[in-house]
Amino acid sequence: VICYRGYNNPQTCPPGENVCFTRTWCDAFCSSRGKVVELGCAATCPIVKSYNEVKCCSTDKCNPFPVRPRRPP
């Protein structure tokens, strides 16, 4: 399966890793920069912790970088 591993950076996952994931969470700069985003491949969907969100899928390029809401001018 082909997953995004970074912004506009699709790569073929290693054997045995057939799940793409998008994990997001807030850090100290969340209010000014938005959530931290991690994209990648995994054998199984990562475990969701209380402070982050995880979305998993299993088709090629199904985990693009999330669109961040824009602030009004």
Swiss-Prot record:
Disulfides per UniProt: C3-C20, C13-C41, C26-C30, C45-C56, C57-C62
Keyword entries, A-Z: Acetylcholine receptor inhibiting toxin, Disulfide bond, Ion channel impairing toxin, Neurotoxin, Postsynaptic neurotoxin, Secreted, Toxin
GO cellular component, one term: extracellular region
Pfam families given in the database record: Toxin_cobra-type
MF (Gene Ontology): acetylcholine receptor inhibitor activity; ion channel regulator activity; toxin activity
Tissue note: Expressed by the venom gland.
Major site of localization recorded for this protein: secreted
Domain of life: Eukaryota
Keyword set includes Acyltransferase: no
Localization, UniProt: Secreted
UniProt xrefs under InterPro entries: Snake_3FTx (IPR003571), Snake_toxin-like_sf (IPR045860), Snake_toxin_con_site (IPR018354), Toxin_cobra-type (IPR054131)
Gene3D superfamilies: CD59
Job of this protein: Binds with high affinity to muscular (alpha-1/CHRNA1) and neuronal (alpha-7/CHRNA7) nicotinic acetylcholine receptor (nAChR) and inhibits acetylcholine from binding to the receptor, thereby impairing neuromuscular and neuronal transmission.
Protein family per UniProt: Belongs to the three-finger toxin family. Long-chain subfamily. Type II alpha-neurotoxin sub-subfamily.
Protein name: Alpha-elapitoxin-Aa2b
Organism: Acanthophis antarcticus
Lineage, opening ranks: Eukaryota, Metazoa, Chordata, Craniata, Vertebrata
